[in-house]
Amino acid sequence: MFGPGRFARTAYRVRETTPPDLGLSFVARVGPLLVGANAMTPIFIGETPAHLLGPLIVEPVFRSRGIGEALVNVSLEAARAAGGRLVVLVGDAPYYARMGFRPAGPGRIALPGPVDPARVLACELVEGALEGVAGKLRGA
């Protein structure tokens, strides 16, 4: 996930130019071990402020224990508490659906590189936040 191929990934192109919001990014520990982490990067979609969630990573031996879901949920709650309205990501729809993400819709969000439109997901932190949102995704 963090190897040289990451530079070709579309979402990483945005993250290379914009630092994450450390107040919305978290780590998971089991005892002294760092077992997971995520990041939230401030972005714009057209002129609409939002956040890009990811990467989300959990050490392989600690997967399927709810750690990734907990990291996502704490980031979403922190973003909501900070006044955020919309979070997007590029990821697996079945996994992220249980955390409130749904497909953003084809052609709505233009990323700076190739991406499967079915993997562009959005979570409205405020009901209706995705309505009327369209345009190029770029770092804030």
Residue ranges and their predicted role:
Residues 110-140:
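C-terminal "cap" of GNAT-fold acetyltransferases
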Residues 81-85, 90-116:
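Conserved active-site alpha-helix within GNAT-family acetyltransferase domains
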Residues 31-32, 61-62, 124-129:
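Short loop segments at secondary-structure junctions
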